[in-house]
Amino acid sequence: LNTGVANKRMVFSISASLMNEIGAAELELGIKTHRVQQVTKKSNLMVSNTVFHRFQNLKLSQARPVIKLRQLAACTIVLSLAACASAENDEDKGKIGFVQGFIGGVVADEPNAALIGRDVLSAGGTAADAVTAMYFASSVTMPASASLGGGGVCVIFDNGAKKVEALDFLALSPKNIPAGIERPTAIPMNARGFFMLQSRYGDLRWAQLIAPAENLARFGTQVSRALAAELKPIGSALVQDEEAARVFSNSKGLPVREGDFIKQFDLAATLTEIRTKGPGALYVGPFANRFVNAVNAAGGYLTKEGLRSALPVWRETVQSLPYNHKIAHFAPPAAAGGVVGAQMWSMLAEYDDFDDADETLKSHMLAEVAMRSFGDRSQWAMPTGHSRIDPKQLVSEGHIKSLMNGMSESRHQSAQTLSSVPQATPETPSALSLVAVDRFGSAVSCNVTMNNAFGTGRIAPGTGVILSALPGLNGRGPMSLGPMIVMNPNSNEFYFAGAASRGVTAPTALVNVAARIVMGGQAPIDAIRQARTHHGGAPDQLYFEPNVSSSVLTGLKSKGHQVAPVQGLGLVNAIACPDGLPVRPDTCKAMNDPRSYGLAVGAE
């Protein structure tokens, strides 16, 4: 990787004295704790060859390097993974380079996190391991959306178990919030959520996945372009908080900028607790008690019982109608973008001519199905993103066909004439996307959010944890979230995993990219670079990016669309394997949106 920036390699060991046994804290989760208990199995755990890349003046075009992986020329494509696996030495598992050949791929909104995820896959980790490590790294490098104070949702495909499911760990509202609380806060869920994910689907030691994030916080990291972009509009307000100013202001008291060096000692100490004692330390026991007091001191509201009892939930995914034997799985409400995406996908599957459509017709059909989905959302979605109606009913064949009434290839239907008229609602653009695929053909796609950029704008004193805003107030919440995975249940093959952010445009951008690849046969890189359009129905206007061609715009206008330009429509992170994984790993591409400052690594 040659980006013209300094790279620093840190090797460190974790003292046996820190390897405390896991107590009752994890038992409060009611789930298996063997992944955390593995921390105690070695008296001296060496986490080696972890690379921390310092990004200085990282150009957009430089944030998408292709990592060349060694190929096994003597193996056929079908047998290569099995042959490689037989050559792996379990004694080296956990060390970078353990996996020879195809390792999978990762995508993250912040480059340091993606590089750590890549190292995890190289060390023999699963997609769940990689996403877990990327999340905790992001809690240090992208706290605007990924602080330990927030929550999220993931969709998981396990190739071995032939199973797809969703994990809901969205940040919850405390019960009975007293009047007069200055800045009400949601209950933190990320630590428990990713522990539950890794407990079920991970393979590496818990401590090994947390240690890179802990080091980033303790030894410091440079502000990436991704974080600088999040800080720019609200940095001045953020540093009014004394605790936040200690981290995010420079020697002159001004917000830090790209390239500035920051250390987060309090957050490092919190991550040490999570690494050595498991995530339960944040929810039960002495540290949890201090955390509750710190949240309340920061103007929030949290109780010991509320913190202890907040648990992630495994849920069924929202499944689309089939297209060419493939099913698209989306996160369920309260990640309401999942139903919006599943309905859009299902209407395109019923339409069944997306692959033969020209660019004008593709943009038109994407707009028509989107505004119908948003119109339907106005009927079923609560302000928190939860559904008044069973999600299965919302994606049933009968309901999808009813949504398609009046839809035409040749003419735009006025949003006001739909059976469910779309309603304009505010939605926070603040969220973060993480995607990983491993060498076994398993995949994980996740969104995490603080329900507002930097949550409440307060840090719980002494913990380094930025606190999440309450969901459901003034558009703050998971309404636009909806990570997805496309797979074939008959052949048990993986084809696409993705997650998106940037508010109301997130589900339309994600389906746009996925449909172009899976239904339209477009090359993955071309699909994510393709100029986008968006139609939310309120107002009845089709928005387009500046690089949409004049011929397409002319065609859309001729179909009755009112069009308006915007600078960018959604940010998508995705991994696509057009010919299926694990059979054809050579077709896989990891893709970071060129509209963002993240990084895609591997999957080549």
Model-derived regions, located:
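Short, small/polar residue-rich loop motifs at catalytic or cofactor-binding pockets
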Residues: 315, 428-431, 453, 479-481
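Noncatalytic scaffold domains of N-terminal-nucleophile
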Residues: 86-115, 119, 125-284, 289-326, ...
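Internal maturation/activation junctions in enzymes
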Residues: 350-449
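Extended C-terminal subregions enriched in glycine
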Residues: 510, 519-567
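Bacterial N-terminal signal peptides that target proteins for export
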Residues: 50-73
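C-terminal motif of bacterial Sec signal peptides marking the signal peptidase cleavage site
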Residues: 82-83
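Residue-level detector of structural "landmarks"
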Residues: 1, 25-30, 34
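Active-site rim segments in enzyme catalytic domains, especially the processed small/beta chain
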Residues: 128, 140-146, 153-157, 165, ...
